[in-house]
Amino acid sequence: MGKKMMTTDGNTATAHVAYAMSEVAAIYPITPSSTMGEEADDWAAQGRKNIFGQTLTIREMQSEAGAAGAVHGALAAGALTTTFTASQGLLLMIPNMYKISGELLPGVFHVTARAIAAHALSIFGDHQDIYAARQTGFAMLASSSVQEAHDMALVAHLAAIESNVPFMHFFDGFRTSHEIQKIEVLDYADMASLVNQKALAEFRAKSMNPEHPHVRGTAQNPDIYFQGREAANPYYLKVPGIVAEYMQKVASLTGRSYKLFDYVGAPDAERVIVSMGSSCETIEEVINHLAAKGEKIGLIKVRLYRPFVSEAFFAALPASAKVITVLDRTKEPGAPGDPLYLDVCSAFVERGEAMPKILAGRYGLGSKEFSPAMVKSVYDNMSGAKKNHFTVGIEDDVTGTSLPVDNAFADTTPKGTIQCQFWGLGADGTVGANKQAIKIIGDNTDLFAQGYFSYDSKKSGGITISHLRFGEKPIQSTYLVNRADYVACHNPAYVGIYDILEGIKDGGTFVLNSPWSSLEDMDKHLPSGIKRTIANKKLKFYNIDAVKIATDVGLGGRINMIMQTAFFKLAGVLPFEKAVDLLKKSIHKAYGKKGEKIVKMNTDAVDQAVTSLQEFKYPDSWKDAPAETKAEPMTNEFFKNVVKPILTQQGDKLPVSAFEADGRFPLGTSQFEKRGVAINVPQWVPENCIQCNQCAFVCPHSAILPVLAKEEELVGAPANFTALEAKGKELKGYKFRIQINTLDCMGCGNCADICPPKEKALVMQPLDTQRDAQVPNLEYAARIPVKSEVLPRDSLKGSQFQEPLMEFSGACSGCGETPYVRVITQLFGERMFIANATGCSSIWGASAPSMPYKTNRLGQGPAWGNSLFEDAAEYGFGMNMSMFARRTHLADLAAKALESDASGDVKEALQGWLAGKNDPIKSKEYGDKLKKLLAGQKDGLLGQIAAMSDLYTKKSVWIFGGDGWAYDIGYGGLDHVLASGEDVNVFVMDTEVYSNTGGQSSKATPTGAVAKFAAAGKRTGKKDLARMVMTYGYVYVATVSMGYSKQQFLKVLKEAESFPGPSLVIAYATCINQGLRKGMGKSQDVMNTAVKSGYWPLFRYDPRLAAQGKNPFQLDSKAPDGSVEEFLMAQNRFAVLDRSFPEDAKRLRAQVAHELDVRFKELEHMAATNIFESFAPAGGKADGSVDFGEGAEFCTRDDTPMMARPDSGEACDQNRAGTSEQQGDLSKRTKK
């Protein structure tokens, strides 16, 4: 066998094996495992063959629970089957995992070990998820590196086939799954040679088949269940030997030796760490560094975690060990110790011999950095205080568990390793370009290469830091670069925010992308700290105006290839001419599908970069550059002590005491960021403005503030604070201004695009030309009182004079979701509950520390919460039940008070509140009166009522989520909640893909669209969720598209919120995953075209109209204008199929057009047919409810819980279970 080297990441290395060894894969996206499924789906679309000569059969399911069920079924029917998951996804699979292991089926689950959402969600790596599944009966095999992920994946598949025991192969999320390394991969023929064909044949022979049938999954009684559970023992006893055997067989092919437990370190070690996962790489690097100094230390790497084989553990442990520290990357509150520690302790206790001192340590939760200095601290603790149940990597100033860490500990990377940092802006291409650079270096030199990428939680436009290493020796540094030879800053705003040169080596290279072309410019703009570091460390300092080059060649903000060219020119890893040639080849490979124009723009950028790099010779005076005195903006203590350190990349240094134990964060912290990362921002041209407020309405980041001011409020305004006479009779006496928030603007340009006048009132200009003038103007405008009462709140213009209670989110520039949500908060924000499904809207909506939801000037605002991906509807339903129960109790108290304590004004206010408690305006009106009248009241019924003042105003419960939630994983709960009849509002932001996990197909994805998990174009149609829900008949349903009709959107919101029952509003939302060819600055235009073309028809279904004898269905959009082909081809998700599968593309587009035509005709028919006209229900009311007469035995919605009858409070299931005669004797029925 010849060696085949590949520069790849852990996910791809694993998928390479899983694809080869599997016949079926059932998948569902979850970060950070998704790319395994994406790669497998892409290979299958290309017709790649596995070791059986087949193309993998791969299907996306509606959830991880569904994927696990499909895996179970496929295994039961005799196909070797795999899946890929992590975190909450793995938890959803646990019930099926018990079934799969109980039936001895040889499936393999590949898991990118990730944190579990507890006090907060974390998409990053630790071992909480895999430990939560350790009791399922799956064998568990751990990998520590990218190479091991490949090798152990193969061992897992081979051992599963022979042992009949399913395997969970896991490796650290992000740290291994997304780390790029140069590794050796095996050919499929070599893998096939290792398969036990006899065991495979036996598996197939035992599978379910009507040709030789048997029964599985029986129900067993107490007489036999126990025995059946123990019958599998012999299979598990054989697993360790089988795994060890296949480790040896893989070693015979690769030369890489593995054991169930591997030991590295001094043969006579006295201090030994036991750990598993990527931490082992860092620990081994430290051991190699300290071994030369005679340190008697070692490490046991756990590979086979389940079954845990004590004999193999003791065979690996040096007899000289006096102190052992077991490191766990999890937290199990209330347990005497974490899982691996308890396993090790149990092994020693069962052995019954003298025990060394055994310590427990916790590290690395949520991908918390685990550095060589921390490893040194763990070893020092074993020879010093021997602190037990410690934490390392944090400062625990609450319970005192943390170990001290000396961050000045030595650089332990192998000598000659070159280390680089690239500070980029999300979506500027930096990360993608660095992945290419690593692959170019790895594939075209003898050097070892490593790449790792850290991000904040912004959807795009956030900070990205790429950490690259390369050298002549293998790289085991599974931690961030902290001593860099080369630092590149790709956004000039960063030099004033972050300490980007922290840790750079003396004589290192610093490359800046900025428009500052002269030393005078640099002296003016560079902070003193940066200048001092440059001069004192004698750095080589270069600048390149990458944005200008990108703009000139037509790339916009995509500066990646320009900065990569600079890197190859300065780093000296490859001869520069060769590097440029390889870079251009990579451009053709990466962008060839997007057309020659895109390729040429990128190659032109490379050519221009070669001649545009400018070296600066700086003066010695920079060594002592005086520190600036910055005026701190008015902020609160939480911002200064918590938010600011996190924003400046210093969050690792915050102690435990800085945080609330339950994970809560205050609202409105995003307003303090002021990142200033846009390239261009809008400039207001007053003389062209028609004062329509549409620009503010569509702004994705709430960066446009329409201002109404009285003359006296403009006294003392900045000189260029231009204000016009406000138009409209209601606004007589007011001045009007559009104020741009330049530092929070993301520069998408939607505002300028939709500005109605021919001569635009908003013109995009470079940020540097606007900042100095508009920052003072914004500060002044923000102090002018909001004029929220002058125009109707639910009008287009009036809505934008309401204070937005969601602003400056972490969404992508031009996001199609955020404008909708901001407007909803402007209409109802001060009384909203928001139950948000996990997804884009939860990540841009609540990623610590920047909270875009905010309070108004009275301290009121959306109460926002996130539970899980799958249960947002139920979560919001629970909020509604809580409000119902608590306000019902309040109403009971008010009624009792009227009978006893209340008199005069209090009595009148209570009567008014009781009559209008379910009306938001009246409940607030009388509630405000009660607050004044009962102020200071402490005792009696009135005291109780006063204590419940936060319940006076009727609350508005909203459930937010994307199409992945509503159409797929959360559909069951959504359907139940809508069917309940309860008063909740559901708002679905339909981007037609799983946006948050990177653009995978959902059931909202239309026919012919290319998405991840649908690489060959989706072959089935879009789920018609709106019409499905309409079949209930008592749910308000509407579709909206802001870019087509803002008025219709506002009308829908008003109707949906006022409807006394469930409402569902589905909004068409643009997304970067759709690949808008004109860019996200055309989001509103695309929304408009979507409706005009017939792709996204607008309609409303209001059950209240049926009660009045009217047609509840109203079609709000016109007939398609014939532009659907143009609409589809303006998006890469449709256009890209032309290049890969042209015949399929043509057929599928025709199919889409036919589906849209049929649907619109059906909608027209519904709008033209009123079946309610001739038999409106007797007693129909305007609100849609029906009076069925006194004493009628019906479940009702008004003033009663869902499952109680109005007269008796007895359980009521709306007769879903049938009559008592139909049900029979319930006592004899089998329960679940």
Curated annotation (Swiss-Prot):
GO biological process: electron transport chain; response to oxidative stress
Binding site for [4Fe-4S] cluster 2: 699, 745, 748, 751
Record: residues binding [4Fe-4S] cluster 1: 689, 692, 695, 755
Binding-site residues, Ca(2+): 983, 985, 1056, 1059, 1061, 1063
Residues at which thiamine diphosphate binds: 64, 817, 840, 962-965, 991-996
Residues noted as binding [4Fe-4S] cluster 3 in the record, renumbered to the chain: 812, 815, 840, 1071
Entries under SUPFAM superfamilies matching the protein: 4Fe-4S ferredoxins, Pyruvate-ferredoxin oxidoreductase, PFOR, domain III, Thiamin diphosphate-binding fold (THDP-binding), TK C-terminal domain-like
Name the UniProt record assigns to this protein: Pyruvate:ferredoxin oxidoreductase
